[in-house]
Amino acid sequence: MNCKIVGYEFKSLEVILAPGETFYGERRSIVYVDAAIQREVEFNATSNGVAGKLGGIVKSALSGESILILKFYNPTSTDKKIVLSGSCCSLFPIKLQGESLICRKGLYVASTNKLQLNINLTFSGIIGGFFQKMTGEATVFLDSFGTPIEKHLSVGEVLDVDENH
């Protein structure tokens, strides 16, 4: 799989899927997809069964993400292209290696593997609200206003971040 951010002022994500590869994206992020790419709608749920799906629906509604996520699959013998974009002007890739990322709700655009998407409710100081928590092993592409600031926290270190940034 080859992922490349293209564009100058308004960024898009070009994904070349080799035969047999999969990719995940937010339903509203599609710009265009080669016709041969199979798309499968999956529930954004962390567990199976009715209770897991209902929990996924509630979490999705609170986190600002779609209840459904798209799984793209290339069933052909040649490379195929997907182009995705966020609603803002920039995309920011972050590689997760089994750890969690907490960010503003609604920023998830796509990922190289399926992630566990949850809500993170925060009541810290005067700032509180619903944030989104992503956990798994994937490169995640987030919607971004301007240039993001990446901050790795030490054990026990805490930052108060306004939910609008």
Model-derived features: positions:
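Phosphate/adenylate-binding glycine loop and adjacent helical scaffold
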Residues: 1-165
